[in-house]
């Protein structure tokens, strides 16, 4: 029998887009799904709208495994955690209610995950759709080969983090629920930045301990990320470089291993320097792309210009 895949969707005042997403999920090429929506204390009619869609859908298809839960507002992290407690699948994937996925999204993630028994998770590329500018671009459809797969798992993950952005979010991946439940992994509640990254890193550490130390890559842009629907809190959090620094510190702690040889430690330091440069550039781009006045943008960017140039020079050596 085909494995049951749990799909967790947090909803907060996004009823219309959630219904659009759910309608597409009922037409996925992979059918053995458990779809769990979690209303995170919506202040509009989202809960009722989605509930009615589910009721009507079940009248048409009695085998449809779709439900909606409700909780007081805790953010997407809290909503996902509640969803995880209710899952009964073998694998789990997360989708944001204002995003979209292509028809073979779940099937492709599953095939990639199960292709290699040692795979901890599978990850796909995505379409980055900028709603305000009405543009879109495909990302992460290329293979990454850093040569570290057989050397050191955490160094390999660090090299992926420093190479591009496919490993940071939870939304374009499929995870093993057995690993999550055994290690009691949750999303950190109350963070306004990089909670996804912390969840992924905690998961990968637990997966490594369970002898899952490979990553399955789906080289297709199957996840459609709609940029421009974020809340003001989410948008402003990426403007603060202190948030990027905290995330970097968390990654630095995660990658440490007392058993590392001097050679592996040196290798990790090299990739950490590259990652820090990447974070500085990503922060600068987030500020540059914002709608704030130029004078305010410079206030955020000015303290970073000289350190950025200095670090870039070091890495060239």
Region spans (language model):
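Flexible acidic/His/Gly-enriched loops in nucleotide-sugar-dependent glycosyltransferase catalytic domains
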Residues: 62-64, 102, 106-185
């Amino acid at each position: 029998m085909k494995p049951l895949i749990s799909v967790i969707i947090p909803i907060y005042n996004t009823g219309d887009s959630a219904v659009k997403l759910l309608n597409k999920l009922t037409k996925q090429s992979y059918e053995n799904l458990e779809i769990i929506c979690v209303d995170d204390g919506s202040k509009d009619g989202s809960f009722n709208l989605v509930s009615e869609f589910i009721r009507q859908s079940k009248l048409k298809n009695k085998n449809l495994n779709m439900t909606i839960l409700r909780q007081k507002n805790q953010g997407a992290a809290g909503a996902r955690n509640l969803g995880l407690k209710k899952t009964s699948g073998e694998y789990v994937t997360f989708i944001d209610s204002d995003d979209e996925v292509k028809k073979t999204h779940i099937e492709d993630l599953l095939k990639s995950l199960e292709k290699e028994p040692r795979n901890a998770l599978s990850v796909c590329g995505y379409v980055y759709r900028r709603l305000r500018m009405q543009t879109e671009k495909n990302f992460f459809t290329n293979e990454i080969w850093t040569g570290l797969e057989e050397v050191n798992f955490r160094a390999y993950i660090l090299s992926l983090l420093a190479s591009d952005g496919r490993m940071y979010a939870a939304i374009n991946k499929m995870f093993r629920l057995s690993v999550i439940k055994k290690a009691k992994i949750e999303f950190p509640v109350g963070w306004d930045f990089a909670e996804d990254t912390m969840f992924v890193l905690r998961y990968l550490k637990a997966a490594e301990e369970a002898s899952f130390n490979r990553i399955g890559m789906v080289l297709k842009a199957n996840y459609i990320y709609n940029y421009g629907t974020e809340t003001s809190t989410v948008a402003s959090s990426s403007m603060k470089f202190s948030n990027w620094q905290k995330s970097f510190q968390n990654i630095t702690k995660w990658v440490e291993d007392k058993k590392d040889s001097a050679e592996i430690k040196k290798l990790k330091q090299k990739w950490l320097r590259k990652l820090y440069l990447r974070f500085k550039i990503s922060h600068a781009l987030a500020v540059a792309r914002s709608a704030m006045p130029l004078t305010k943008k410079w206030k955020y960017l000015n303290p970073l210009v000289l350190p950025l140039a200095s670090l870039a020079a070091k890495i060239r050596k």
